[in-house]
Amino acid sequence: MNDVAIVKEGWLHKRGEYIKTWRPRYFLLKNDGTFIGYKERPQDLEQRESPLNNFSVAQCQLMKTERPRPNTFIIRCLQWTTVIERTFHVETPEEREEWTTAIQTVADGLKRQEEETMDFRSGSPGENSGAEEMEVSLAKPKHRVTMNDFEYLKLLGKGTFGKVILVKEKATGRYYAMKILKKEVIVAKDEVAHTLTENRVLQNSRHPFLTALKYSFQTHDRLCFVMEYANGGELFFHLSRERVFSEDRARFYGAEIVSALDYLHSEKEVVYRDLKLENLMLDKDGHIKITDFGLCKEGIKDGATMKTFCGTPEYLAPEVLEDNDYGRAVDWWGLGVVMYEMMCGRLPFYNQDHEKLFELILMEEIRFPRTLSPEAKSLLSGLLKKDPKQRLGGGSEDAKEIMQHRFFASIVWQDVYEKKLSPPFKPQVTSETDTRYFDEEFTAQMITITPPDQDDSMEGVDSERRPHFPQFSYSASATA
């Protein structure tokens, strides 16, 4: 019954996600939903264990189209925490029909199995998934937090999905950053899973260089994260002003980032995946705070890989562009890019034309300013290796390999974690409402928030059961 059998196999043309070329891939569809692709037809078991593409057709939607090529079909499914789309084409309508029928049959079979398992498990809470266990075990806040519990002081930032506002909690007088996301935009842009991931990761993470979550709650049309407020500003803001950081300053920030990523990888089995200067903040004392967990992957162990696309183009690792499976090493590529920016004052690869940019990331050798020390060059060369298996931190030792690099020879890692190192720059903030390190384009704006509806003042059972955002509410004090 548990034997995994191949349902269908053969050649398909697969379209790249970023570099929109069609690549021939030999795909195997298995009855457990696995849909794996290879450059060549695998001849033995060893070759089968290293696929280039690894998808699941569970809960998928299939669409047939004649664009951009005849006999195209698109698979859309939720994978890990993100909705993904993969585009394939074959030579004839008959071939397409065979593939789509086989995929739909496997997906339907898995759905039936899941429904049977759910029936069998009802009344047995110990069998639930980790995410469900976590949500059930969260203590509910005694007082339901709502938008009326805060004063709205200044706009700190604005994006596609919503805004970030400096708020003051009326009951305690404490200051927080409130991230307010519009549900309709999140749903329209397939960001539901990313957003729920951010909520889960923030709830479960306790580390000095990760932004702490105080509360999360929802209204009928918004999701709200009330987070620790780091008013030292974005690292991007400071680097833009100073153009380049000294190696000592870059080493300090780099060490704190490595400490946080090590915690996420080893303690939480999470890959951050979106490391960039804009997601690195400074607190009032000048220590790093990593923000914005919307692109995190959950459940990544050593050797585990993932298949979804997101991230800023300039920071994308080669294995992501190549449309290959990727794992924790993407974070070390991201670290390489941000540390290169800090020490060299520019991105390692840049072109306004995305196709040319991707070509540079995949093919171009890294270049360094003459002023860079041999240790810094060695570190950056290791972190920016194109092959993730050869990359510094790409092996089973993960962060430990980077910690042992000679660039960090002077660093005592326990002292980093305990914040015993003096920050090389202390933000000159005079109060908690001082926003001098935030862009005036935002802070000078009037805050406009549509008043919550009457029924939003109490987040009732119905809102908690909404299909897109179940069990969203959280209070750190209730779980402390």
Swiss-Prot record:
One of its GO terms (biological process) is response to growth factor. Residues 450-480 are annotated as: Disordered. The modification Phosphotyrosine is found at Y176, Y474. Residues 5-108 form the PH domain. Glycans are attached at S129, T305, T312, S473. 1D-myo-inositol 1,3,4,5-tetrakisphosphate binds at K14, R15, G16, E17, Y18, I19, R23, P24, R25, N53, R86. Disulfide bonds join C60-C77, C296-C310. GO terms for molecular function: ATP binding; calmodulin binding; potassium channel activator activity; protein kinase activity; protein serine kinase activity; protein serine/threonine kinase activity. The modification Phosphothreonine is found at T308, T448, T450, T479. Residues 409-480 form the AGC-kinase C-terminal domain. Keywords: Acetylation, Apoptosis, ATP-binding, Carbohydrate metabolism, Cell membrane, Cytoplasm, Developmental protein, Disulfide bond, Glucose metabolism, Glycogen biosynthesis, Glycogen metabolism, Glycoprotein, Isopeptide bond, Kinase, Membrane, Mitochondrion, Neurogenesis, Nucleotide-binding, Nucleus, Phosphoprotein, Serine/threonine-protein kinase, Sugar transport, Transferase, Translation regulation, Transport, Ubl conjugation. ATP binds at L156, G157, K158, G159, T160, F161, G162, K163, V164, K179. The modification Phosphoserine is found at S124, S129, S473, S477. Pfam families: PH, Pkinase, Pkinase_C. It catalyses: L-seryl-[protein] + ATP = O-phospho-L-seryl-[protein] + ADP + H(+); L-threonyl-[protein] + ATP = O-phospho-L-threonyl-[protein] + ADP + H(+). The active site is at D274. Coiled coil: none annotated. O-GlcNAcylation at Thr-305 and Thr-312 inhibits activating phosphorylation at Thr-308 via disrupting the interaction between AKT1 and PDPK1. O-GlcNAcylation at Ser-473 also probably interferes with phosphorylation at this site. Phosphorylation on Thr-308, Ser-473 and Tyr-474 is required for full activity. Phosphorylation of the activation loop at Thr-308 by PDPK1/PDK1 is a prerequisite for full activation. Phosphorylation by mTORC2 in response to growth factors plays a key role in AKT1 activation: mTORC2 phosphorylates different sites depending on the context, such as Thr-450, Ser-473, Ser-477 or Thr-479, thereby facilitating subsequent phosphorylation of the activation loop by PDPK1/PDK1. Phosphorylation at Ser-473 by mTORC2 promotes ubiquitination and degradation by the proteasome. InterPro entries: AGC-kinase_C, Akt1, Kinase-like_dom_sf, PH-like_dom_sf, PH_domain, PH_PKB, Pkinase_C, Prot_kinase_dom. It is an enzyme of class 2 (transferase). The record marks D462 as: Cleavage. GO terms for cellular component: cytoplasm; mitochondrial intermembrane space; nucleus; plasma membrane. Belongs to the protein kinase superfamily. AGC Ser/Thr protein kinase family. RAC subfamily. AKT1 is one of 3 closely related serine/threonine-protein kinases (AKT1, AKT2 and AKT3) called the AKT kinase, and which regulate many processes including metabolism, proliferation, cell survival, growth and angiogenesis. This is mediated through serine and/or threonine phosphorylation of a range of downstream substrates. Over 100 substrate candidates have been reported so far, but for most of them, no isoform specificity has been reported. Interacts (via the C-terminus) with CCDC88A (via its C-terminus) and THEM4 (via its C-terminus). Interacts with AKTIP. Interacts (via PH domain) with MTCP1, TCL1A and TCL1B. Interacts with TRAF6. Interacts with GRB10; the interaction leads to GRB10 phosphorylation thus promoting YWHAE binding. Interacts with RARA; the interaction phosphorylates RARA and represses its transactivation activity. Interacts with MAP3K5 and TNK2. Interacts with BAD, CLK2, PPP2R5B, STK3 and STK4. Interacts (via PH domain) with SIRT1. Interacts with SRPK2 in a phosphorylation-dependent manner. Interacts with RAF1. This is RAC-alpha serine/threonine-protein kinase. It comes from Bos taurus. The lineage of its organism: Eukaryota, Metazoa, Chordata, Craniata, Vertebrata.
